[in-house]
């Protein structure tokens, strides 16, 4: 698996940490794709679409490498939240999600342009928040950095105290569904070996 270079098309520190956690060797090349979450497709299709766009934008100049693209969104009843642009948007998101159960959806694309191979999938996790108040929202935004996180919160930081329960992959909520990724990553390598007659 180590003979082909891997590129993560994301500068997310959480994705980098998670991929290192499973021993993956990779470089980082941030995609310049700007997501538009107003497309008239389902939330799952939306996450997959932008993951593919990110991976493909990097694979154009890296055909011999495996490029990994990902996009995480928060969905509540087809209200889709990406990363907040500012403090007001962050507060608005957190107010909306208080006391509710929402979905965290991550789309992933694993692209090997040299052989026109691509594995795409998405992972969903249901997250239920307890009720929290305005003061707690303000304090969270003051102490943490929610502006690079879908839905404006990190389950791995101090906001964990407001998480009542989750149903599904924890790592997906952090930003990358490790187990599902590794399954597809291994299968892609198997397909490459079979194509090369190994």
Regions found by a protein language model. Name each.
Residues 2-24:
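N-terminal beta1-alpha1 ligand-phosphate binding loop
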Residues 2-6, 42-198:
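Anionic-ligand binding patches
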Residues 10-12, 31, 98:
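Short linear Ser/Thr-Pro motifs
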Residues 15, 35-37, 117:
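Flexible, glycine-rich phosphate/dinucleotide-binding loops
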Residues 17-21, 38, 60-61:
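Short loop/helix-cap segments at secondary-structure boundaries that form the rim of catalytic
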Residues 26-27, 193:
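A local structural micro-motif
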Residues 27-36:
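A short beta-strand-loop structural module common to alpha/beta enzyme folds
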